[in-house]
Regions:
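Canonical Rossmann dinucleotide-binding motif of NAD(H)/NADP(H)-dependent dehydrogenases/reductases
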Residues: 6-37
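Active-site helix of classical SDR
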Residues: 121, 157, 165
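Short, small/polar-rich loop/turn modules that mediate ligand/substrate recognition or access, typified
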Residues: 173, 178, 232-234
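The beta1-alpha1 cofactor-binding region of Rossmann-like NAD(H)/NADP(H)-dependent oxidoreductases
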Residues: 44-45, 61-71, 103, 215
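Residue(s) in the substrate-gating loop at a strand-loop-helix junction
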Residues: 141
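Substrate-binding pocket helix/loop in short-chain dehydrogenase/reductase
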Residues: 97-98, 105-107, 202
Length: 245
């Protein structure tokens, strides 16, 4: 995928959940646009492959663990000396109807999605404030706005990320930091775990008749990370082919 629009040379971009799918494509986007790109993921084997593919630095970390996150950001600072762009994309699924969701499944999903978004952002804020510049883009979901059967934990986590995005945007604006979110329905491994009949039903309800490609998510994130988007903050951008209309 070529990038003819943005130049992120001299900036460091961190992407979580970056070993595959949307995260990998986002990493590729920033690397091709000249950023010092850091991929963070829990899966070390896939992370090594992804890092080699896009020419980025890979850091294995558990976004649901504060010590692991803080160590990862310290590693980034030791390597590049700055943090400019943070894309919170890490996520997992533990889909069940709510009366079958265990405490463990509930805590795991919220810990990665909402907890990871919080921990990474918190760890980067001191560096954003010192630089008087920063871009945070959180990946939420159509489900966070509208709910979905069998995804009470996921919907709650994604809705929480929307609230976090708007609150962080208000708190960080005076430091030159923007905080936004995208709401995608991308074609990734997480989507492919949905039963085919349910997937076809969802696709039929999308005005554009298909799921997004991860590169389309990356392009939207690239815009929100750019200096051209410097006056946009607290926004939740649907990138879903009109599904949320």
């Amino acid at each position: 995928m070529g990038n003819l629009t943005y130049d992120f040379s001299g900036q460091t971009a961190i992407i979580t959940g970056a070993a595959r799918g949307i995260g990998l494509e986002i990493g590729r986007f920033f690397a091709e646009a000249g950023a010092d790109t850091v991929l963070i993921d829990f899966d070390e084997n896939e992370l090594d492959i992804a890092s080699d593919q896009v020419g980025a630095k890979g850091i294995a970390a558990d976004v649901s663990n504060t010590e692991s996150v803080d160590k990862a950001i310290a590693d980034v600072m030791a390597t590049t000396g700055r943090v400019d762009i943070l894309v919170n994309n890490a996520g997992i699924l533990r889909d069940k109807v709510l009366w079958k969701i265990s405490d463990e499944d509930w805590d795991a999903v919220l810990g990665v999605h909402a907890g990871g978004t919080f921990r990474l952002t918190r760890a980067c804020v001191p560096h954003f404030r010192q630089q008087e510049f920063g871009r945070v883009i959180n990946v939420t979901s159509y489900t966070g706005l509208h709910g979905n059967t069998g995804q009470a934990n996921y919907a709650t986590a994604k809705a929480g990320i929307i609230g976090f995005t708007k609150t962080a945007a208000k708190e960080l604006a005076r430091f030159g930091v923007t905080v936004n979110a995208i709401s995608p329905n991308a074609e990734t491994r997480m989507v492919s775990s949905i039963p085919p009949d349910k997937l076809a039903e969802i696709a039929a309800g999308i005005p554009m008749g298909r799921f997004a490609h991860p590169s389309e998510m990356a392009a939207a994130i690239g815009f929100l990370a750019s200096r051209e988007a410097g006056y946009i903050t607290g926004a939740v951008l649907p990138v879903d082919g009109g599904l949320s209309m």
